[in-house]
Amino acid sequence: MSTSTRQGSRLHAGEPGAEPLFRLTRSSERERGLDQGTNTSGFAACGLDGQLQNAPQARRFVEVTLNGWALQLLVPDATLVVSELVTNAVRHALDPAPDASEYPLWLGIFLRPGDLVCAVSDPSSTPPCQRNPDDSASGGRGLNLVSALSDSLHWSLTPPQGKTVWATLRLPAKAA
């Protein structure tokens, strides 16, 4: 296992007024040619309807995409990271009433030099909150897992509404 500098157990918000990492909308899906799903260009995204079954759907999407990009070594960590980010968005970022949007959540994964970025956009502007649950708690460890598995964990507001939470994973030496 390669060593890397991790950002640790904190979320790093963007600078005030900074542009979000990315924001996906239904219209941008068509603009980016993503209506076909995964691709080999190093960018793939899918809309999620905000249901609890989105976590396994997201894991499968990431697995298929990374296998297509010949990044099988990242599948275990990336699928767990994405599963936790999607689960947090479903549990904490959606109103109980159905959102008017067909896809209130968007999952995007893309390659940057040396990194894989896994990002989830949701309609809530409430910042994500890392917790330190006691040993008997049955939940509250998701972002801690993401921090432990990733090289960095960030979030930013995505005007006009919502936020994007993303984690980066270092690419294997051969892929970087």
Regions from the language model: what does each represent?
Residues 1-44, 90-176:
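Conserved beta-strand-loop-beta-strand hairpin that lines the nucleotide-binding pocket
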Residues 73-97:
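Conserved ATP-binding N-box helix of the HATPase_c
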Residues 33-76:
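Helix-loop-beta hinge of the Bergerat
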Residues 56-59, 63, 79, 83, ...:
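Conserved terminal C-lobe alpha helix of the protein kinase catalytic domain
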